[in-house]
């Protein structure tokens, strides 16, 4: 059903890839041999944390008397009282447990299970689904690029829209949790802290700040990943399949968007991953090792993505069997091969809804009904020839990743112009926003327009008359 093919990589000078605190040295890929590109533009993470619980179905309601400004909150804030946390002692009461990456956690699966027993109303069993926490972030200081902060705001809104529609919690971080682990390493301390703060979440979904969710109907196929603990966009044939005569590539997978299970395996994995980062006394040596291992790596630093590929390549790797390399759909897709096709994708989706017998797809509905209506549209894709994803298909790309564009710093990959990045982001953001605005009866006046216009009744059938 899903198919994708890799496209090639362009070398990015390290000096163009390093923002003061947030950038990544990922190679950005024009269409040639390795598919999606790899910049990490999001990192900077948590001290000051904005936790967006927009339409969060998992947040318990406060008692009626606590929803007013003058309410007595004594019962809710009994200092140091286990009763305030549900009446049973949990791992949160252990002073030895730390949120920081320099202090390993053991027995995490049992700790999570104990917490779930103490809070059955918040457990996965109570929800009936595996809960997902999306984590993203940007630097704590204002952007250096004119308009960069506004672009980050739109990118944040895009993630908040998707999470609201699908009942996913969103954690957006704007400060470093560990000053030594900045730029592309900053996400590891954030994810570690998020796992501890959200034991109810089965999965943590890291999404770089420069990634746009461009299919608001698509839901993560979590059943596909049973038996795995880490899902990244990549190709097994490229990660593992290089022969002695072919060079390994650090761009054979993308570490800018991934799913990681909230479990002990993942904590151990991140400890091993971080051991190749700037906190390690072997950091310089790891940079040399990784540069030697990957002929297409042009900078000397040890980065998260090269380290991840290297970990998977080692003989007897304890990690490989639990890592799912997703290439069946645009888990994250290279923006240069996507943005020019968005207009044609819109036309094909509208044509699908104008087909005989498709009136139910056009029917107006409340935003709260998004999931069943999205499922109906997804079910109709095959009949309209839109089921195939990737560069050869016309299904909406799930995630469009603007690697190399650096919207905050403005230090773009030298192969891109500011106009191409800015216009591409506006197209992708408006493309996604139109899917959201439809429930409100509007759409953008054009793919690059900030203006909106009302939709006629029975759109898009009425629009063609």
Where are these regions (language model features)?
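Catalytic core and acceptor-binding pocket of nucleotide-sugar-dependent glycosyltransferases
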Residues: 40, 186-189, 193, 265-463
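N-terminal anchoring/stem segment of glycosyltransferases
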Residues: 2-4, 8-12, 16-17, 23-202, ...
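Surface-exposed beta-strand-to-loop junctions
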Residues: 133-136, 166-173, 247-252, 270, ...
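Short amphipathic alpha-helices and their capping/turn residues within compact interaction modules
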Residues: 164, 168, 196-200, 218, ...
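Aromatic-acidic/polar surface patches that form glycan- and anion
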Residues: 127, 148, 152, 180-184, ...
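Beta-strand cores of modular interaction/reader domains in eukaryotic scaffold and signaling proteins
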Residues: 98, 133-136, 164, 169-171, ...
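Short coil/turn segments at secondary-structure boundaries
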Residues: 146-153, 175, 217-220, 270-273, ...
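GT-A fold catalytic core of metal-dependent nucleotide-sugar glycosyltransferases
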Residues: 177-178, 183-267
